Amino acid sequence: MSYDYHQNWGRDGGPRSSGGGYGGGPAGGHGGNRGSGGGGGGGGGGRGGRGRHPGHLKGREIGMWYAKKQGQKNKEAERQERAVVHMDERREEQIVQLLNSVQAKNDKESEAQISWFAPEDHGYGTEVSTKNTPCSENKLDIQEKKLINQEKKMFRIRNRSYIDRDSEYLLQENEPDGTLDQKLLEDLQKKKNDLRYIEMQHFREKLPSYGMQKELVNLIDNHQVTVISGETGCGKTTQVTQFILDNYIERGKGSACRIVCTQPRRISAISVAERVAAERAESCGSGNSTGYQIRLQSRLPRKQGSILYCTTGIILQWLQSDPYLSSVSHIVLDEIHERNLQSDVLMTVVKDLLNFRSDLKVILMSATLNAEKFSEYFGNCPMIHIPGFTFPVVEYLLEDVIEKIRYVPEQKEHRSQFKRGFMQGHVNRQEKEEKEAIYKERWPDYVRELRRRYSASTVDVIEMMEDDKVDLNLIVALIRYIVLEEEDGAILVFLPGWDNISTLHDLLMSQVMFKSDKFLIIPLHSLMPTVNQTQVFKRTPPGVRKIVIATNIAETSITIDDVVYVIDGGKIKETHFDTQNNISTMSAEWVSKANAKQRKGRAGRVQPGHCYHLYNGLRASLLDDYQLPEILRTPLEELCLQIKILRLGGIAYFLSRLMDPPSNEAVLLSIRHLMELNALDKQEELTPLGVHLARLPVEPHIGKMILFGALFCCLDPVLTIAASLSFKDPFVIPLGKEKIADARRKELAKDTRSDHLTVVNAFEGWEEARRRGFRYEKDYCWEYFLSSNTLQMLHNMKGQFAEHLLGAGFVSSRNPKDPESNINSDNEKIIKAVICAGLYPKVAKIRLNLGKKRKMVKVYTKTDGLVAVHPKSVNVEQTDFHYNWLIYHLKMRTSSIYLYDCTEVSPYCLLFFGGDISIQKDNDQETIAVDEWIVFQSPARIAHLVKELRKELDILLQEKIESPHPVDWNDTKSRDCAVLSAIIDLIKTQEKATPRNFPPRFQDGYYS
């Protein structure tokens, strides 16, 4: 219930609701609640006494009667469980005085204020009604002036003089320089006498691409866009850029050449740049010809006559500062067949850019299978193919493997052949359904064909096996066969995820054979400690066989030279976004033909190899050519903001021009979410908040959390949380030590009931250990199962975020630990409130279920009903919560719907940083609700005070976003300081103050 007041605030003179004024009644009164749901035990008529159903009901009606009665019980239980929002008399009087003091100022301003949290009621397009109002022309003039002022503010925000550190290299001029041209030519000629260069030249000459150098250079010179396709190992990534640069230098035009080559992964950008530098007998970066730039890390080449390898995101960042990429002569988009979201967007941007940069050369490099599609997208531009350089690889399908090793599964019962088939997980795609129908239709004919070519026992096993599961026992049997019957060589096993990798590792280690020092078994996954994974690149001593168990990271991101045998499990973990239910899903999908080809190629790098595909021939014939492009299976909010900050036009229009446009439903859902976040106005233009969020290199909700961390002066811990959510948390899980790792994580959690604060505690403990020296840092990471590399990355990201905030004016120092930005960093509840401000409306309700044996907690969301906290969370076994609400970062459906990264939050967190507030009465219970479903008990006068204080917060936050500057906490008489202090005080003192539980401290040789 809203209230338009014209009187002073006070305990007896406050706004009155339909239920009366503020005069009497205790702040948390419950009188009469229990009576409302009692009585009526036999009120159903007939023989319904003692809670039994009426006698005239039959069959389904009886069930419905009991269901209705249970629903009433649940509703009443929920009423009784509601937390009470209260404040003591002293704070109530202080807030009344505060609201009175700002009343006069607010009366002079328009009442059409913008709420960050309830854009349905207020927005940038809100109009003040002028009908039947005296002096309406004057009001219209005022509104026009406000709109003009708004445009001026937007101009200032957009054009604030701040250049991201990652963009500095691009903005260096690239003018032709005759003196430099001559020097570059002389340096290249000298290199040809350098023994290191000569040695590398011998290697380069063996690559298939080297023999096509003239043809490639001529094609690029004579066309604005060229598509180059080639197999793995042909040399296209390392050689084409060098061909272009050397051609320019030899023609005396070296200073005019500045090549930028994009890579889909950080590791690729670094490794390729270092390889090219080595081939040119140079060190990487240091002002030489070749360098790299990835987020927060770079070794930059010289300004002109150079090659820069960078991640795709770096170029998208550059476009904010220079939309024409005016200093770049050649842009090479590599690995475009992977179809990640950023590369798809960049292709469309570059396609538009060609209309303004006739001098820009664009080279698209892809695997062979779909080069034609890219050529068509760029107006049928010319294509050229470079043959691969791999040894022959013998391929086997599932039926071949079973016949070869005579495998018999443990389970003898006949399987349900078509239980799920192509419809893995919950991915509801029409193509998958169609392929499932085809598979089912063709299966009988395929079995008859198998019986003509394979033994009866093999066909029986094929029919017996579960088609939708990876048979790990089969993989163990196949590895044993290779070890005992085949020649030496490393074995690479592809599995979809951590659970499969862990289980296979355990199965192997349970056998005496694999426990010996004749085997080196290496799991390869992002959750594994990096130090263990470095062994994967080292060749083993004679007599030792290496077995690598990996996800699809080993398809393209890394090369293991000594692999001879590849076991393709046939599955890949893929994330999709269900627009109808607004939920991400992750499931094990069948690999595509492109995946299978990449996996096969891993076996033939240094000698002839073998590839075992663990799916049958019918399945192989129906595999998709490629994985679904990322743009079609991911939320689009961050991309929508990028489109607007780059001024690429209307969101839906731009996205419709991509090679594979996302669905209208996905686009509209993302736009709606951004409007709810108040990042876009009703005309789909960026709001001041939207501009700031678009410039932060994170997802919008995390960006909002960062801004609130600055405004509420708890910057350092909030930046740690933001970095972790946008990159990954620093925890690792060594195989066999999962339970110990979980215990250590809960130890770091202390009593916070927060995954987010657990990461903060881990990070702060690492910082303290690092200050003491390398040995202490190493011991700390070892004891708490932390990755020092990830922690260092989080540290670097925090510095980048602070740079953004300084450039935008939100803080006065680029140091995340600046005391002025961390006044409230030692209070857990303020940090939780800021987490809530960023992640809302990702809220779940906790309900305690008192079972006969032990307490249990059930968790519900508004849209999904019953969900589960992810097993990795510190809250997974928690039953003693202070409050009934969790805020979470990610909701994903796998085997169940899981909440990832969750934190317990208090009522005041949700009231001040949640959605729209309403004041209601539920029977005899006075309530205050957030978005109508998060309901608390509250006396009416307290509810009105909270609602009015929230309005003041919304006004203040909007002013801070439009004109960013740090809060002056010393100016206690200012409105900003008074409003924020009052809210902080309420959050800090609800129930009882909760001091931060700090990370383990090093004492007497131990962390405690």
UniProtKB/Swiss-Prot annotation:
Residue list for modification N6-acetyllysine: K947
GO biological process, any: positive regulation of dendritic spine morphogenesis
Catalytic activity: ATP + H2O = ADP + phosphate + H(+)
Chain segments annotated as coiled-coil in the UniProt record: 72-157
Residues where Mg(2+) binds: E335, H337
Subcellular location: Nucleus; Cytoplasm; Cytoplasm, Cytosol; Cytoplasm, Stress granule
Segments of this protein annotated with the region Required for the pre-miR-134 transport: 1-104
Result of changing P54G: Reduces G4-RNA binding
Region (Required for G4-DNA- and G4-RNA-binding): 53-105
Region DSM (DHX36-specific motif), annotated ranges: 53-75
Residue numbers spanned by region Disordered: 1-58
Region (RecA-like domain 2): 387-628
Effect caused by changing G63L: Inhibits G4-DNA-binding
Cofactor(s) annotated in UniProt: Mg(2+)
WH domain: annotated segments: 629-698
Chain positions of motif Nuclear localization signal: 517-528
Chain segments carrying region Necessary for nuclear and nucleolar caps localizations: 1-200
Helicase ATP-binding domain residues: 217-387
Helicase C-terminal domain boundaries: 477-647
Domain comment (free text): The DHX36-specific motif (DSM) form folds into a DNA-binding-induced alpha-helix that together with the oligonucleotide and oligosaccharide-binding-fold-like (OB-fold-like) subdomain, selectively bind to Myc-promoter G4-DNA-containing structure in an ATP-dependent manner. Upon G4-DNA-binding, DHX36 pulls on DSM in the 3'-direction, inducing rearrangement of the RecA-like 1 and 2 and the degenerate-winged-helix (WH) regions; these rearrangements are propbably responsible for the ATP-independent repetitive G4-DNA unfolding activity, one residue at a time.
PANTHER family per record: ATP-DEPENDENT DNA_RNA HELICASE DHX36, ATP-DEPENDENT RNA HELICASE
Subunit structure: Found in a multi-helicase-TICAM1 complex at least composed of DHX36, DDX1, DDX21 and TICAM1; this complex exists in resting cells with or without dsRNA poly(I:C) ligand stimulation. Interacts (via C-terminus) with TICAM1 (via TIR domain). Interacts (via C-terminus) with DDX21; this interaction serves as bridges to TICAM1. Interacts with TERT; this interaction is dependent on the ability of DHX36 to bind to the G-quadruplex RNA (G4-RNA) structure present in the telomerase RNA template component (TERC).
Protein name, UniProt field: ATP-dependent DNA/RNA helicase DHX36
Origin species: Homo sapiens (Human)
Lineage: Eukaryota, Metazoa, Chordata, Craniata, Vertebrata
